[in-house]
Amino acid sequence: MRKYRVAGLVAALLVLHSLATPSAQAEAHRAGGEGEEKMSSDGGPVLGGVEPVGNENDLHLVDLARFAVTEHNKKANSLLEFEKLVSVKQQVVAGTLYYFTIEVKEGDAKKLYEAKVWEKPWMDFKELQEFKPVDASANA
């Protein structure tokens, strides 16, 4: 009987621990804004949080940013030209969501756009989720 009582207590403690841990992560997630790095109560990054990548020269990331511009041009019947990848953040989901800030050329003018690309490399899948100009008033 004692063995079952100990097993029951251990199971109860595991349930309580699993209930307490997600709420600490959810609190840390709510504390940060979209696009900011979020930290859990133990100081580590929140799982599923948006994190800076910091390697704008990575060929794979540049290719994904070019893909975003090409897909936008197809959907919007536009003629934007990719210039450079300015910054990139990532979020691990069912695959990876990349948040790009991209410099493009529209005629003679250079402009900044934000793009969100969802990639699942094991399925050879990538999809442009969002493509919009950077709000100039937000940078002022």
UniProtKB/Swiss-Prot annotation:
InterPro entries: Cystatin, Cystatin_dom, Cystatin_sf, Prot_inh_cystat_CS. Residues 48-135 form the Cystatin domain. One of its GO terms (cellular component) is extracellular region. Gene3D superfamilies: 3.10.450.10. Disulfide bonds: none annotated. Pfam families: SQAPI. The keyword Secreted applies. It is found in: Secreted. The record marks 48 as: Reactive site. Residues 1-26 form the signal peptide. SUPFAM superfamilies: Cystatin/monellin. GO terms for biological process: defense response. It comes from the Eukaryota. The keyword Signal applies. PROSITE patterns: CYSTATIN. Its main location: secreted. Keywords: Plant defense, Protease inhibitor, Secreted, Signal, Thiol protease inhibitor. Introduction by genetic manipulation and expression in potato or banana confers resistance to insects and nematodes. GO terms for molecular function: cysteine-type endopeptidase inhibitor activity. Belongs to the cystatin family. Phytocystatin subfamily. There are two distinct cystatins in rice seeds (Oryzacystatin-1 and -2) with different specificities against cysteine proteinases. May be involved in the control of germination by inhibition of endogenous cysteine proteinases. May play a role in defense by inhibiting exogenous proteases such as those present in digestive tracks of insects and nematodes. PANTHER family: CYSTATIN FAMILY MEMBER, CYSTEINE PROTEINASE INHIBITOR 6. This is Cysteine proteinase inhibitor 1. It comes from Oryza sativa subsp. japonica.
